[in-house]
Structures are given as C-alpha cells and as structure tokens.
C-alpha cells in the first residue's frame, strides 16, 4: 500500500521518519519545501503539490496543527478529495474536536472514501522514537489495513470503535 503523509511539523516529522525507516513506500507533502527536500534525501517521494501526493497514495495520513487547516485540507475546494475519484483511506492524526472529525468523516464518506480519526499521544519525543499511543475510530476494515503503518509509529494501537469515538475518548481526558 502506498502511503502519503501530510504535515511535517513537531509530531509529523518523527511519524514520517518512522514510516520511512520501517519500509513504507512513502510520499510526503507539507508547506515547507525544505522539509520536503530533506525527506527526499532520506528516500521519500517528495510531493510539492497536494494533488501529486493524493494521486500517488492509497492511505493518506495527516498531522496538522489546527482545526482550520484540517478542514481546509479535507473538505476544502482544493483539498484531498478534489484530486481523486478513487477510494482512499484518510487518517486524521491532528488534534481536532469531535465536531470537526464528524464533518471530515461525513464529507469523505460522501466522496466514496473512508475516514479514520486517530488522535495520538506521546509528544514529539514519542513521535521521534516511534512510541506513540494511537487511538483509532472508524471503519474496522480500514483500521486493519492501516494498522501495520500505525505500528511503525507507535507501540500502543487501540481500535476504539466507530467514527469519532477515538476523538471523543481523547477529549474526555
């Protein structure tokens, strides 16, 4: 399965590094061209346009800094789904509220793809060391297909049930 990763910030960089070092066929996209270039030097496919990443990925993981960026990336006019008609698995590792996850999930499902909300804990050190805890909500089959990649980034992977349940659990603490 071809993996795309969007967002190479404090958490995303370590997560993407672990995917790459564990053998994932990885494409990356982020706002910083320097970060894309650095990942190319490590062996990832650098995507300087979102469309390139979407068209070269079956599984798309994103780790973004805020609600507005997540919504724009997922539901925006030039977001992920505007570049494909093929079924994709979209995983949101961003820290967003349950309502945002619901909006994203409903939109992605309406476009024929699947959505997993997958909040993470462990901080930048856990992301770098591959010891994150990842709670996942959404389609069980999509979770099973994605699980080997979660295991490349974390040591505790927990399926929480249906869509939004992982985010609801995270926000309850």
Question: For each of these PLM feature ranges, what is it?
Answer:
Residues 1-62, 88, 93-94, 124:
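NAD(P)+-binding Rossmann beta1-loop-alpha1 motif at the extreme N-terminus of oxidoreductases
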Residues 50-114:
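Rossmann-fold NAD(P) dinucleotide-binding segment
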Residues 40-43, 76, 85-87, 128-131:
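Acidic, glycine-centered active-site loop in nucleotide-sugar glycosyltransferases
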Residues 21, 41-42, 85, 110, ...:
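Short, well-ordered coil/turn elements that cap or connect secondary structure elements
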Residues 16-18, 40, 72-75, 102-106, ...:
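Short amphipathic alpha-helical segments
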Residues 96-173:
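Rossmann-fold dinucleotide-binding core
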Residues 32, 66, 139:
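Residues in the short beta-alpha loop(s) of Rossmann-like NAD(P)-binding domains
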Residues 7, 15, 35, 49, ...:
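Hydrophobic alpha-helical segments typical of transmembrane helices
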């Amino acid at each position: 399965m071809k993996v795309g990763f969007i967002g190479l910030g404090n958490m995303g960089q370590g997560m993407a590094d672990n995917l790459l070092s564990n053998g994932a066929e990885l494409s990356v996209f982020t706002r910083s061209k320097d970060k894309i270039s650095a990942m190319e030097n490590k062996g990832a496919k650098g995507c300087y346009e979102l469309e390139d990443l979407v068209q070269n990925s079956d599984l798309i993981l994103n780790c973004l800094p805020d609600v507005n960026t997540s919504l724009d990336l997922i539901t925006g006019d030039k977001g992920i789904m505007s570049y494909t008609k093929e079924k994709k698995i979209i995983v949101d590792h961003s820290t967003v509220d349950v309502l945002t996850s619901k909006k994203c999930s409903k939109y992605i499902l309406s476009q024929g793809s699947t959505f997993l909300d997958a909040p993470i804990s462990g901080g930048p050190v856990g992301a770098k060391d591959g010891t994150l805890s990842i709670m996942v909500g959404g389609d069980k089959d999509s979770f099973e297909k994605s699980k080997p990649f979660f295991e490349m980034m974390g040591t505790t992977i927990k399926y929480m049930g249906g869509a939004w349940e992982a985010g609801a659990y995270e926000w309850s603490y």
